[in-house]
Swiss-Prot record:
GO MF annotations in UniProt: tetrahydromethanopterin S-methyltransferase activity
Organism whose genome encodes this protein: Methanococcus vannielii (strain ATCC 35089 / DSM 1224 / JCM 13029 / OCM 148 / SB)
Pfam families recorded: MtrC
Function statement: Part of a complex that catalyzes the formation of methyl-coenzyme M and tetrahydromethanopterin from coenzyme M and methyl-tetrahydromethanopterin. This is an energy-conserving, sodium-ion translocating step.
Known pathway: One-carbon metabolism; methanogenesis from CO(2); methyl-coenzyme M from 5,10-methylene-5,6,7,8-tetrahydromethanopterin: step 2/2
Lineage per the UniProt record: Archaea, Methanobacteriati, Methanobacteriota, Methanomada group, Methanococci
Protein name according to UniProt: Tetrahydromethanopterin S-methyltransferase subunit C
Transmembrane domains' residue ranges: 18-38, 39-59, 62-82, 84-104, 106-126, 152-172, 180-200, 222-242
Record has Protein biosynthesis as a keyword: no
Chemical reaction(s) catalysed: 5-methyl-5,6,7,8-tetrahydromethanopterin + coenzyme M + 2 Na(+)(in) = 5,6,7,8-tetrahydromethanopterin + methyl-coenzyme M + 2 Na(+)(out)
A GO biological process held by the record: methylation
Length: 269
């Protein structure tokens, strides 16, 4: 049943479980991309899609409280918070390395630092939406925190996959100066906001929404693979996306009470 008429079906997968899986997969993907650059796009890009799926799942839950047109907006807020946090995670180690003597390479903690900053930023933004903004959604603080985290992991995950690592020099030259971070913002943002926005309604199904979220995450990976001109990743991502999106279409046709196909447009009035 929906909260506030938002069109939210019963949960098949616990939100926190999806969140943990998405976060762990994206973190693993970033470390693979950093230590094995030859597999950066193939595995790093694939696993970055996990953050998109988890973010889309959280969007589904918070949007069920009747956000209406706020469904796309909250996705953009997620990536706004995520971008700030990802950049902070990349730059903080390089700044501290020049001023503080540490017994280990702080660069290796970049994804973790980005995640911590994202949680803090999301919590603050969530509190601000309660006061002074005045939103009455009871889970808004926790949801903003989770969306900020998933936004940061998605942004940093795809940028790391493209750049071949998450050190400041690699990200700045391989993802920021060339504008790839803007592509990450749009691709990951659409993957997080679109699934529930497309499936919302009285017949919304958690399984169908998650399937579309997976397809959107895989499409983001495909877009990055094409931008990188990584042939193997392009082929694998295309196969995965076609299969997943085909599954979503099949579910939609099966769940629909009636399917009407658009006829051929008349050649004359």
């Amino acid at each position: 049943m929906s909260h506030g008429g938002g069109g939210h079906a019963a949960e098949l997968f616990p939100e926190n479980q999806v969140l943990v899986i998405g976060a762990v997969l994206s973190l693993i993907g970033m470390y693979i991309a950093h230590f094995v650059p030859s597999l950066a796009m193939l595995l790093g890009g694939l696993l970055a899609a996990g953050a998109c799926v988890a973010g889309a799942n959280t969007t589904r839950r918070v949007a069920a409280y009747g956000l209406g047109t706020g469904v796309p907006s909250i996705g953009m807020v997620s990536l706004g918070m995520g971008t700030i946090s990802a950049l902070a995670g990349v730059l903080i180690p390089s700044v501290l390395a020049g001023s503080v003597a540490l017994p280990f390479d702080l660069v290796l903690a970049t994804p973790i630092i980005a995640a911590v900053v994202a949680i803090i930023v999301g919590f603050i933004v969530g509190k601000l939406t309660q006061n002074p903004v005045g939103m009455k959604v009871p889970i808004i603080v926790s949801s903003m925190t989770k969306l900020s985290l998933m936004g940061a992991l998605a942004i940093l995950g795809f940028c790391t996959a493209f750049a071949g690592g998450f050190s400041a020099d690699l990200i700045i030259n391989g993802a920021i100066n060339n504008g790839i971070i803007a592509l990450a913002f749009i691709a990951a943002g659409m993957s997080i906001l679109h699934p529930f926005n497309a499936c919302i309604g009285p017949n919304e199904s958690h399984k169908r929404t998650i399937t579309l979220a997976t397809a959107c995450g895989l499409m983001a990976w495909l877009v990055f693979s094409i931008a990188k001109l990584d042939i193997v990743s392009i082929l694998v991502a295309a196969v995965f996306w076609i299969y997943t999106y085909g599954s979503f279409v099949s579910m939609s046709l099966a769940d629909a009470c009636e399917v009407k196909y658009v006829p051929e447009l008349p050649k004359k009035e």
